[in-house]
Amino acid sequence: MRDEQATGAAITFDRVEKSFAQKGGAPVMALSDCTLTVEPGAITGIIGRSGAGKSTLLRMVNGLERPTGGRVLVGGRDVGAADGAELREIRREVGMIFQHFNLLASRTVFGNVALPLEIAGRPSSEIRTRVADLIARVGLEALADRYPAELSGGQKQRVGIARALATGPKVLLSDEATSALDPETTQTVLRLLADINRDLGLTILLITHEMGVVRDIATHMAVIDGGRIVEAGPTYDIFVRPEHPTTRSFLSGVTGVTLPAFVASRLRPAPPEGPSQEVIRITFAGRHATDPMLARLTGELGIAVNILAGAIEEIGPHPFGNLLVSVETPRGAEARAYLERHQLLTEVLGYVG
């Protein structure tokens, strides 16, 4: 049965709750009041620390876990209420890749990719054609007859991706799919997922504890903390204006911009007596990311600026940068007002004497 109001979304988490019974004790609440909409064709990353509830949330999409409250809808169909034939139909539309690959050691690359099609009862001729196409898509044509023990970690994950695509799903779930890979292989797998998303229009929902993965691939993101979704939206918007402390904590490890230790150790929440400097974070976003605003600030207002740290990178197609600076405290408000008039974001981090 479809929910007509939710059929426009690929996946809808509607006030989802999940608790687990404990022998001789009160139930443990894993998820509480989680609401999130995953748009068709988006790559949505759910980030959270270990134990935050992200894997539990992901496993509800294909019915591996059932909510104890709320609903999980895939294409408007309630996964938690589905059973038998309807649940099998939903699962055919949802592929999944795993952190540890889950390949059958006794089957070749071809055999692993073919397995879902064999289970679905597809004709042999269709299986051969489909598997050959998928193996080519993930760049493993030369390894079709190899066994998992003969493959690298990145190659195993490519097999996992091809297998997940075998039945032509509309949604692909990624459960920490790159966390067991080295950085270079991680980037290769992320590029492959981005290509699949672009070429097939596939909706991808991934979970990770690495903000770098979200930055590199996700169009949208959600932050989960203590079983609750505390922030969600377009990835670029959240990187530019993070609101929740958990989000800020994750971002501090990926933007590459932290205060030097000799400044951080002296930072105070209020100006000390005597001469002091106001420490400011400046966020450069979009078309303003490469503007020479500090030179203009000094030239037009005569405010001396000390640069403490900085970096610029890309979030999707958009440039994004952070700069940590200090100015004389009496002129801090004037400097911030000037920068904000020119569409930059500022935040006072504290003061040093």
From Swiss-Prot:
Does this entry carry the keyword Iron?
no
Where is the ABC transporter domain positioned along the sequence? 11-251
Q: Name one GO molecular function term.
A: ATP binding
Record keywords: Amino-acid transport, ATP-binding, Cell inner membrane, Cell membrane, Membrane, Nucleotide-binding, Translocase, Transport
**Cellular location of this protein?**
Cell inner membrane
The way this protein sits in the membrane is described as:
Peripheral membrane protein
PROSITE patterns xref list: ABC_TRANSPORTER_1 (PS00211), ABC_TRANSPORTER_2 (PS50893), METN (PS51264)
Q: An example Gene Ontology cellular component term from the record? A: plasma membrane
Q: Which domain of life is it from?
A: Bacteria
- Indicate yes or no for the key word Secreted: no
Q: Where does ATP bind?
A: G48, R49, S50, G51, A52, G53, K54, S55
InterPro entries according to UniProt:
AAA+_ATPase, ABC_transporter-like_ATP-bd, ABC_transporter-like_CS, ACT-like_dom_sf, MetN_ABC, MetN_ABC_transporter-like, NIL_domain, P-loop_NTPase
What's the catalysed reaction?
Answer: L-methionine(out) + ATP + H2O = L-methionine(in) + ADP + phosphate + H(+); D-methionine(out) + ATP + H2O = D-methionine(in) + ADP + phosphate + H(+)
Write the Enzyme Commission number(s) for this entry: 7.4.2.11
- Per the record, the major location class is membrane
Q: What does this protein do?
A: Part of the ABC transporter complex MetNIQ involved in methionine import. Responsible for energy coupling to the transport system.
Q: Family, per the entry?
A: Belongs to the ABC transporter superfamily. Methionine importer (TC 3.A.1.24) family.
**Subunit-level organization:** The complex is composed of two ATP-binding proteins (MetN), two transmembrane proteins (MetI) and a solute-binding protein (MetQ).
PANTHER family per the record? Answer: AMINO ACID IMPORT ATP-BINDING PROTEIN, METHIONINE IMPORT ATP-BINDING PROTEIN METN
Name under which the protein is recorded:
Methionine import ATP-binding protein MetN
